[in-house]
Amino acid sequence: MFLTHLSLKNYRNYESETIEFANNVNIILGENAQGKTNMMEAIYVLAMAKSHRTTNDKDLIRWDEDYAKIEGKAMKKNGALSLELIISKKGKKAKCNHIEQQRLSQYVGHLNIVMFAPEDLNLVKGSPQVRRRFVDMEIGQVSPVYIHDLSQYQKLLQQRNHYLKMLQTREQQDETVLDILTEQLIPLAAKITLKRYEFLLLLQKWAAPIHHEISRGLETLQIQYRPSVDVSEKIELSRIIEAYSEKFATIKEREIQRGMTLAGPHRDDIAFSVNGKDVQIFGSQGQQRTTALSIKLAEIELIFSEIGDYPILLLDDVLSELDDFRQTHLLDTIRKKVQTFVTTTSIEGIEHDIIKEAAIYKVHSGHITAPLCD
């Protein structure tokens, strides 16, 4: 798939900009704080209906304006795609091919994106929350049902935590409501756990050979899912439901004492190991970067295997974080099959062959030029 057109209105530091893109490589050139990352974020938000940089949608709206608007046109293997997202202080409205979407879960997944930015190194060395968010965003691109289940789970989790807090402070003493909330939570927790497990098995399948190649055959990557309940390769939904039921029965009194839900997908983690050693704890910076790069390249292949179309790749100021070998491997892998957006302050560090093929744009103070000539 290719993003051919992007229009921004009142988005971050962009007042009103429209730009046409090339199908291969698009290099966004400019000094820091001019709007390069904001444009990459806008493409990401157009696809995912949320930012990877902030959880507050108000941050996306230009100062002193009431709303931001992102419009995009893309070509997919099954035809043209038109997307529109309006972000206001009251919420978001989304349209796909000019039809308003009743839920954002219906909207996400039409345009598929893989983002690789310096902060993605935190996927390996950051908190479990970073890894859970990564998994949720990637599954959500190919499974609208997952987004809906996750949203329902988070609402029930909030209600359950609130009631546990009331039981803890003796504001409530009747545990009946807690039991009802637990019964409603368990099937959703089980479905999320199963989907994450299946996704990580696929990610392992694609990432391991990529990592092996990037490490010149010296390293073996393993991805291990660490959920709140035990899972195995032959796990079934009914068995996960049973495991959660037993878990919540066992920890009920402890949850009341703590005033919070102590098991569920919100407490999951993912571990990455190289040659049997945890990369987060024992890995060098080079191994952590190779792991992050392998996972991002695996995402591209995984999405293609699921939908039959390559996603769009966003490389936001990340090439400078990779050595020449990793950069060359990345660019050779994606060349001519994945539409790629690259932000940089200078084209000097980018391979000459890539520059020859690329459309180069200049960003300055929230304004984008047409493609530059060599």
From Swiss-Prot:
The keyword ATP-binding appears for this protein: yes
Keywords: ATP-binding, Cytoplasm, DNA damage, DNA repair, DNA replication, DNA-binding, Nucleotide-binding, SOS response
Positions of ATP binding: G30, E31, N32, A33, Q34, G35, K36, T37
Disulfide bonds: none
Keyword Membrane in annotation: no
Entry superkingdom: Bacteria
GO function term, MF aspect, one: single-stranded DNA binding
Protein localization: Cytoplasm
Gene3D superfamilies, A to Z: P-loop containing nucleotide triphosphate hydrolases (3.40.50.300), RecF/RecN/SMC, N-terminal domain (1.20.1050.90)
Biological-process GO terms, alphabetical: DNA replication; DNA synthesis involved in DNA repair; double-strand break repair; SOS response
Pfam families: SMC_N
One Gene Ontology term, aspect cellular component: cytoplasm
Role summary: The RecF protein is involved in DNA metabolism; it is required for DNA replication and normal SOS inducibility. RecF binds preferentially to single-stranded, linear DNA. It also seems to bind ATP.
HAMAP family: RecF
Family: Belongs to the RecF family.
Name of the protein in its database record: DNA replication and repair protein RecF
Lineage summary: Bacteria, Bacillati, Bacillota, Bacilli, Bacillales
